């Protein structure tokens, strides 16, 4: 089911992206005489995308050609989107600048997006460590609690066991007291997840996990089975107390308000210690106040991942990236350590967060 949706989506995006690019370029060069010629460009591109997808399906193997072909194809789509964006920007410029050599313009349209895409492919491989701190009067320890947050790992065709090993190295280097994974640990990889997550066994502190939308494509019992074998504590509609802090996990597919109401009514969300909510998709902290939530840790947005998604996301989400505050309630959004669909990022970084909880004087 999921593979079929991805297949149709890739065909559509591939065809429309490159069709749009070629139509714009040829229109700019005044090579089109009739509208019918524009449609004639789109059709073969869609067919090409269809056959590329068929190749991918028949070579489906995590160790073989599938991963390489998948990465290559979606990288081409990412490049096409960048070309399309730069085409649109350039056409806007030409509306203001009357005299410009068309071949210079074409060189800019083609060359700049390629460099931009190379940058977008490299930058996610350089993981940023972001440190933030929060203080709470009910946190009684003189020693700050160090929480390492991972989000949106997206294990699959692009990110596999070697990537987990890199993450584990980062965890060990930063020496946290506890690790939390706020969703989308898996992409297309649950069947091999146990072996890929094996490096996490080197981490000797608790690892909490709550499911994101990609994790929810699978049966919950299967996700629990794989994570439990990897020393990961699956936390959904429940709490976990550790070193003077109460962690609350709610899966992406659960009714958030109903789940928090039930936990509060059952006496599991008292304000005697800080309550930290692990939630994949970010929520406005204003909506969390009444449940005694001090801090919500989220991901999901990827901070837009590709331009212009960085701008569109700010319309879609109340809290897109970093810290949002309402009174004494906070939401912190991690932009993710992995990425989805396109193995690229622009105007944003792959990130691991170190969150320190301190005593408020």
What spans do the regions from the language model cover?
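N-terminal signal-anchor transmembrane helix
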Residues: 66-70, 96-150, 156-173, 192
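Non-catalytic terminal accessory segments
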Residues: 1-125
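Soluble catalytic domains of enzymes that build or remodel membrane lipids, polysaccharides, and related
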Residues: 139-361
